[in-house]
Amino acid sequence: MRYIGKWMMLGALVSSSVFADVKVNIHRDVAPLVVNGEKVGFFISKKSVLDFDNGLNQLVVRVEKLIDNNQGEKEKFNSKPVIITFKASDRELDLFVDSVISRSKDAEEFELNPFFILKDKNGDPIQIMKQEILPNGGGITRDYETEVYRYNKKNNIIIASEKLSQSIAEQPIVEMEKGVEMVQYWYEKASNEDKKQFASLAFENRKSEIAKQNTKSQELDMLVYWFNQTSENGRKNIINWIMNN
């Protein structure tokens, strides 16, 4: 399985003759997490395109965007992940949300019933076999691949083809280090002040470890701890991720 999209535009363009049967254009506010049972790479772009074989396919997606909180500050909103099982052949589709999500109130309302629209270029909806919130498997961090496997087993869903072809740029799949994943986790829980302090510390110490900080913030302490447990390349990935969030 190969992922497609404008990952970081580091790969060479592939031949224009390499196309799949169904193309799905992902809206900039929608982030794919799992495609046909396999987790999407760490640096997938907001403006992604996925190519599928004809037939039954599956996506796990969520909304990822900056919104205004109740204090008038910008904060990152990651919605609950939704698993979409759909059937299509020889069509170009658009995946998006039919909701305006710009404030905390909008996000709260969307979370009550997160729903995504999948239409073709004529605006006609395509056959969605099933769409619902992906059940959480428990644990500190989400294991989306395992959750999808259990979901499909419970619902007797079999995806015949898990092959994706690349239509824009081909990139090596980036495996996320444990430290990078944990920094992501604690960063989402941190206050805006802690995020700013950690971002400054991470940038200053991108080639070394961050000295122990005397703070009363568990989130900041854990961010520093996991940053120090990560390789130099992983730290670069963390900094790049912070700059884009």
Curated annotation (Swiss-Prot):
Signal peptide region: 1-20
- Name the chain's protein: UPF0319 protein VV0984
Which PANTHER family would you find in this protein's record? UPF0319 PROTEIN YCCT
Whose protein is this, by species?
Answer: Vibrio vulnificus (strain YJ016)
Q: Which HAMAP family match?
A: UPF0319
* This protein's UniProt keywords: Signal
Which regions span the lipid bilayer? Answer: none
Keyword Signal on this protein?
Answer: yes
Detail the disulphide connectivity of this chain as listed in its UniProt entry: none
Entry's InterPro entries? Answer: UPF0319 (IPR018635)
Report the sequence similarity comment from the record: Belongs to the UPF0319 family.
- Please give the superkingdom of this protein's source: Bacteria
